């Protein structure tokens, strides 16, 4: 804001969004926020639809026959995680499936921690047939954890699961071509596409100062890797 720029795209800025908006307004500089969750009510924002992504992923697994679906990863302080877990829970309820709080496991974004966590989860609850992972790092760790536990991941229906396979689902912010070649179903909101949308939006704000602030929500897409 002190460099004479015509507009600013802000990534994140959780907790300081209001302050940045005030400073930008004083200088007449338009701001657009790239947010991971919905915490800036008064600002011009672009964010992924975390709840829709989780609903889509959970529903896909349910339609494949899974009824005992767990959650792995993220911290309870994360608003992104809260929105995703909300979508997961809402979908279980929609289909009349049980929600078990002990099946929602916090975990650092570490492959090692995720591998350990999924192993412990399945030892305590061996009938779980699918696990939704908070991000790609957690998913990779979970995949290694399944191998260590003598299990496999697979996208097939539950009728093919004879106590050895566990389906994995996960969230990603990269395009289909950049996803790991693992048997995981992904809910992806590509960061590159969001970047193009952000660039278009800031140019609109620069060219027309009367454009009102608004919220744009980008829906996720389902990608299966077999």
Where are these regions (language model features)?
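Alpha-helical recognition/docking segments in bacterial nutrient-uptake
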Residues: 1-59, 63, 123, 127
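Short beta-strand segments enriched in small/hydrophobic residues
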Residues: 7, 60, 68-75
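Flexible loop/turn connectors
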Residues: 122-226
């Amino acid at each position: 804001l002190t460099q004479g720029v015509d507009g600013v795209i802000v990534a994140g800025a959780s907790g300081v969004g209001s302050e940045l908006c005030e400073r930008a307004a004083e200088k007449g500089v338009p701001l657009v926020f790239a947010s991971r969750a919905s915490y800036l009510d008064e600002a011009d924002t672009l964010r992924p639809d975390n709840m829709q992504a989780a609903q889509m992923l959970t529903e896909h697994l349910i339609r494949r026959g899974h009824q005992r679906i767990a959650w792995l990863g993220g911290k309870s302080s994360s608003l992104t995680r809260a929105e995703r877990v909300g979508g997961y829970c809402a979908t279980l309820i929609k289909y009349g499936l049980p929600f078990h709080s002990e099946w929602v496991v916090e975990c650092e974004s570490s492959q090692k921690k995720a591998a350990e966590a999924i192993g412990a989860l399945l030892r305590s609850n061996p009938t779980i047939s699918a696990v939704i992972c908070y991000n790609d790092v957690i998913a990779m760790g979970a995949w290694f954890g399944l191998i260590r536990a003598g299990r496999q991941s697979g996208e097939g229906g539950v009728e093919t699961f004879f106590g050895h396979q566990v389906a994995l689902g996960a969230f990603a912010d990269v395009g289909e071509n950049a996803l790991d070649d693992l048997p995981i179903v992904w809910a992806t909101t590509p960061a590159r596409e969001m970047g193009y949308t952000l660039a278009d939006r800031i140019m609109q704000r620069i060219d027309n100062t009367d454009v009102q602030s608004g919220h744009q929500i980008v829906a996720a897409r389902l990608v299966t890797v077999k």
